[in-house]
Amino acid sequence: MHLIYFLFLVVGCSASLFDFIQNQFGGGGQAQKSPEHYEAQVLNSNCDKYLCPGTSLCVDAPKFCPCPYPSSQLRCFLPDGRYLCISKPAGDVAANYDDPRTNWKVDAKDDNIRDCGWVSRAWKGVV
């Protein structure tokens, strides 16, 4: 009788362990969406202005599109009116980039710190 209880215990623990491992390594997450799903989402949106390609948000103009990961990215404007998103600098200067209304204006004036000032200098070929 003890053998049966022991087997139930081992089987139960094994099932729990394998379920845990499957969830940790991607087995329990959502399936990736196909390009067709993304295309259908874009084509079926009710946006009558501009639909941001990275976030599917409806905004007045492309310059108002946010970065896909605003808590960890800066939106840097290029001289031709476009923008690109880069990772926020880390380390001692990271606090300078916390406010999304002003973080794109900060220029550390240091080519070792990749911020919007660095992007501007790189655009001009100075870096």
Curated annotation (Swiss-Prot):
This is Long chronological lifespan protein 2. The keyword Signal applies. The keyword Signal applies. Disulfide bonds: none annotated. Keywords: Signal. Belongs to the LCL2 family. One of its GO terms (biological process) is ERAD pathway.
